[in-house]
Amino acid sequence: TIDDTVIGDGVKIDNLCHIAHNVVIGNNSCVVANSAICGSAIIGKEVYIAPCSVIRNQIKVEDGAVIGMGAGVTKDIPQDTVNMGFPARTIRVRNEEDWRIY
């Protein structure tokens, strides 16, 4: 089914981004240039999606995750992790110092 796309408070969306039907983007997330979020994906709060990334349909990206530049997300992404590559893989878990920078 095609439902509403919901974009939370404080979300920043850069130019040339594609956000499909039934997508939910949590508060204070950031979607940077030329990224695509396919249908029925759920993006948590305070998620950073770098340029030229693609998030496949029906994927869940948990709160605080980082998606690196050009990543292709084909599986659910755990909370507070840094993910890169094509297909995207978890590189590491974010630490307290990362949060101060972000």
Description of each model-found segment:
Residues 1-84, 88-90:
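Structural signal for interior beta-strand "rungs" in well-ordered beta-sheet cores
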Residues 86-102:
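Terminal amphipathic alpha-helical/low-complexity segments used for targeting or macromolecular assembly
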